[in-house]
UniProtKB/Swiss-Prot annotation:
<dbReference type="InterPro" id="IPR043133">
    <property type="entry name" value="GTP-CH-I_C/QueF"/>
</dbReference>
<comment type="similarity">
    <text>Belongs to the GTP cyclohydrolase I family.</text>
</comment>
<dbReference type="InterPro" id="IPR018234">
    <property type="entry name" value="GTP_CycHdrlase_I_CS"/>
</dbReference>
<comment type="pathway">
    <text>Cofactor biosynthesis; 7,8-dihydroneopterin triphosphate biosynthesis; 7,8-dihydroneopterin triphosphate from GTP: step 1/1.</text>
</comment>
<dbReference type="GO" id="GO:0003934">
    <property type="term" value="F:GTP cyclohydrolase I activity"/>
</dbReference>
<dbReference type="GO" id="GO:0006730">
    <property type="term" value="P:one-carbon metabolic process"/>
</dbReference>
<dbReference type="Pfam" id="PF01227">
    <property type="entry name" value="GTP_cyclohydroI"/>
</dbReference>
<dbReference type="GO" id="GO:0006729">
    <property type="term" value="P:tetrahydrobiopterin biosynthetic process"/>
</dbReference>
<protein>
    <recommendedName>
        <fullName>GTP cyclohydrolase 1</fullName>
        <ecNumber>3.5.4.16</ecNumber>
    </recommendedName>
</protein>
<dbReference type="GO" id="GO:0005525">
    <property type="term" value="F:GTP binding"/>
</dbReference>
<keyword id="KW-0378">Hydrolase</keyword>
<dbReference type="InterPro" id="IPR020602">
    <property type="entry name" value="GTP_CycHdrlase_I_dom"/>
</dbReference>
<feature type="binding site">
    <location>
        <position position="75"/>
    </location>
    <ligand>
        <name>Zn(2+)</name>
    </ligand>
</feature>
<keyword id="KW-0342">GTP-binding</keyword>
<keyword id="KW-0554">One-carbon metabolism</keyword>
<dbReference type="InterPro" id="IPR043134">
    <property type="entry name" value="GTP-CH-I_N"/>
</dbReference>
<dbReference type="GO" id="GO:0005737">
    <property type="term" value="C:cytoplasm"/>
</dbReference>
Amino acid sequence: MDENKIKDAVRMIIEAIGENPEREGLAETPDRIARMYTEIFSGLKEKPEEHLKKVFTVNNDDIVLEKDIQFYSMCEHHFMPFYGKTHVAYIPNGKVVGLSKLARTVEVFAKRLQLQERMTVQIADSIMDYLKVKGVMVVIEAEHMCMTMRGIKKPGSKTVTVATRGIFKNKIEFRNQVYEMIKMK
């Protein structure tokens, strides 16, 4: 990531909106934003397979669900945050992954300029491809600041996206079971 280009661009934006980039409250803002972007876009340097390669053998073909994985991401259309919860369910095919690895996989894709719809598919595809599971279902529920702060201004509205692969694609009873598990306290 080119932090110097980010700093220059932020200075230009500050000037373009009619502010003084040298005034006390703004003088260090380009540096802060460059450091922040390095952090919040760190998923661009990571690959999901780095987190999905360590598996454990099991004799289980029941649904595994990691729910309420909190995330934040940045909308690529408006450069504004969206945030919420991801629920990842899969049916093992003789192997499971450590639960933290599912959350790390979510992070890899969330820490990029993103569309929620694409992120949902990317998470599902990576789990299907690298874990070779019988099926995977990913549900993401998120609030988009571009809907809250600008445009239509509807705070509290949520977007829900779902991606299903393998056995979840054709078996509504498995999808319904995941929805019921997500509702559990």
